[in-house]
Amino acid sequence: MNIVLSPIDRLHSEKLIGVYEAWKRTAAGRLAPKREEITPALLKSALPSIWMIDVIDGGRDYRFRIAGDRIIQFMGRRYAGHLLSEFQGQAFFDQMRGILKACTEQKRPLMAGPGRSKMPGREFSELEVVVLPLSEDGQNVTTVFGAMEIRSVPPAPKLPKGQ
């Protein structure tokens, strides 16, 4: 997936639109909601697809906090407690860093995709992501929260011999 951060109004996924709308209602005109305001009841239909990542030192690093079952299945394992820097040099995680950093620095909701996954073994998946800031102090992004829509993309058809 190329990192093309778009205005939030370009979301395709109804699930991601629902997560964004819940975030917007909860933010109620503030920079962002606090982490404790993002509850399972608020997101029940999207829980398998949500994730939350703590911002470390203003964006110098990020720590995986929670991920829904669909995210864990896609990623192949749980990453909770690990730092994003542990996976530096891997295309999928480097791309993730760019998206998280943009949200942290711009202090606004962003979306990426839809586009092909760069996760090894998951190249035939198309991803669309909504990335939303959370703030404990109302001024700085302290956690990044979001959801990911994962769709299977069939391999390209084989051309007939001689073409």
Question: What residue ranges belong to the model's regions?
Answer:
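Intrinsically disordered, low-complexity terminal regulatory regions
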Residues: 1-90, 94-163
